[in-house]
Amino acid sequence: MKRRHIVLLSILAVLVLAALIYTRPMTLQQIGKVDIAQCESVSGYHRRAPDSEFTSFELSAEDERCSQLIDLFAQQKYRRSLINLLSPDGGSTHRPKDGDFIWDLSFNFGPTDFPDGSTDKGTLIQCRDFYGTLHVFTAIDGKTLRCTTSEQEAFLRLVYDIISAEP
């Protein structure tokens, strides 16, 4: 009986340790395996309720907002959600209220080397805010991860404010 308890506690300890390692804070570079500072442009769209139209944008490297976004995303730490292990990125719904917003950012790169020796270009990292839920897509593995950040609501609002500002 005592041996069974030790085995069960050991299994529980390993599971807790694995969860802590999986959800540890990471930079976007650690998640996407590419240095976001090498990004050449940022494109995407945004929308604020009650508007039904999306506003698209393209920010070149010369645009101050592009460098603001790159710096903001490079400095932020992200925690992968355990829900990623249970459910692939399935659809979700949300009934928007006045003032709710969503955005989608594509970080576009020129030819970029990955740690495994391969090279790629184009949209290598994509970040999406769906009414408060942050999703990060990485091209190197083709996965979309739900992530959280510290002070997430303020972070998501700041990104929206930058991309929705008039040039």
Predicted regions and their residues:
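Function-determining sites in protein domains
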Residues: 3-167
